[in-house]
Amino acid sequence: MSTYKLAAKFAASLYALALPLLSSNALAANGAVADEFKWMTFAVFGVIIAITMGITYWAAKHTHTTSEFYAAGRTVTGLQNGWAIAGDYLSAASFLGIAGLISLYGYDGFMYSVGWLVAYITVLLVIAEPCRNIGKYTLGDILAFRNDPKKTKTVAALSTITVSTFYLTAQMVGGGVLIKTLIGIDYEVSVIGVGILMLAYVVFGGMKATTWVQIVKAVLLVLASILLVIFTWAPYGFSLPDFLQAVVGDAKVQAQVAKLLGDAATNMSKEELGQRFLEPGLFLKSPIDQISLGMALVFGTAGMPHILMRFFTVPTAQDARKSVIWAMAIIGGFYVLTLFLGMGAAINVGPAKIALIDKGGNMAGPLLAQYVGGGADSVLGNLFLAFVAAVAFATIVAVVAGLVLAAASAMAHDIYVGVIRGDKATPKEQVTAARVASLIVGALAIYVGIAAKGQNVAHLVALAFAVAASGNLPAVFLTLYWKRTNTYGVILGMLVGAISAIALVMISPNMTYPQQVIKDAKKVLEGEPAQPAKEAVPAKPGEGFVCELFAVCKKAEAAKPATAEKPAKPGGAEKMAKMTEKLAATTDPADKTKLETDIGKLDKDIKKAEGDLKKFENDKTSMVGLDKPFFLLKNPGLLSIPLGFLCVIFGSLLFRDTRSEAMWDELYVRQHTGLHAEGALAH
């Protein structure tokens, strides 16, 4: 039976499976869409799925050879690849995570947008054209051109799978949260559904299906974002100063800032609180942390395997360069829009309500769409929400497909064909191996998506970028541009860079520390005792730069203002009783809505606190045995990236490799001229 007939049967069976699933008791009652409007969400999701499955059916008929499966036959134009790169790059973290972070933390959330856009300067200037000329399908191909093929492909494959797993986790979390919140399907079932669709694209359609799904998704995402921004910005006459002034003066934003600052907000006016939302420090409190995050985002893109793979789909190096230019224009425009999406969600929906639906803020964009369309009770509002959510869903599945293809390529092409079979596998065996590897990676993606429930997607993606920047980029960059680079340096740099990034994350504030969780839970349930007045405390210098990174000595402390005496804070049950009593007595619609939101949030906090106490009652330390963070930065890039470069240099100087030295001249000529580079297939 032909591949495209298998694809058609798979699509039909998937549809048959979906009907009872979507109407089953798995539907919960706590979604963002009222029951009477859920049919709209089903309908729009169905249209998106039908379009992408149609693309897969078409692509399956044109995917037979290894080059067609891995690189779409190298027939993608620069413009098409630019849109596909944007579709691959503008992930759930971009649309859901960044908009959510901006809506909750203001300026600090926008830092992610800036970092990810600037990253393409590195890709344009030093990566795109040489990689297209030298490589074939994978990161391992680039490194193996002048280094020992089996050794470098093995390490490159491990790194690719590691990075892709981090990134896959973020996308699967985003997909699960989105579907659960909108439709009410259990999170685990939602993740499985995303995984099945993604496998259909990759297994049957390969790179051709993945490319066109990414193009369609990118176009829809940009159009949806433009529409959202128009509706959000129009009430302010498209005036940026007026819009930002509305953000500063919004009571919901001011309340969010006061909550984040705690005691530091005691003597601040409402305007100062609002202004603070447009300044750094609410999420990334340390300037060093901001630098570390920026390094990971800027350098990580050039080491992301699924981005590097896109340069092998175009016929020439010039098209690779055009791809990056188009991608930068599309991505840059989109990231400007995220500022309005996040800020618009903050003033229209409110940080408290956004966090009530999803604590990571991932639903800010869809909730904003519902608001500007007329609200939760309107047909247009729910239709707009359904459209935006369906686009976000397509975003997740398209990016996941690209990641799975990258990881599967590493397993099949680098490990099976390159290492195990010694490049002697037939084309049919290679394609079969790629499809089997895709199934394995897809199953892994579903597993980690379920295991990582409740994490903010932009945060997880930043960690993936740190690993890529620390392990992959030093090896690729120095292989291309330093004559002394050899196999030993590449292996040492990739291993130490990636392992150090992961190890630093394991001892950082990103991990769960049970004693702190229990302490926070008890505050929610039992309240806090009265606090005496405190005098102002001047700033204290730290004991050195190392103290800002590791908990081995005293770090610098900012000045603390004087605070008045604080009364005792009631526990959750007492607070709930008072709020419920107040709700019953109020007649003002605005007050009633606010109280209902606050009660819902408090109820969620109480349930979480009770669950945390039960979950961690027997735990005293994190999974690596720490009771508090040892590494103080949220992102390890500041240390792990230089360490990766140093290890490539050190390993290359310490050991000699005659193959690496002998291949330098050929690599130099080929990366600059494209002589003997892989060409497009003739059709």
Task: Place the predicted regions along the sequence by residue.
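Membrane-embedded helix-loop-helix hairpins and adjacent transmembrane boundary segments
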Residues: 2-15, 20-683
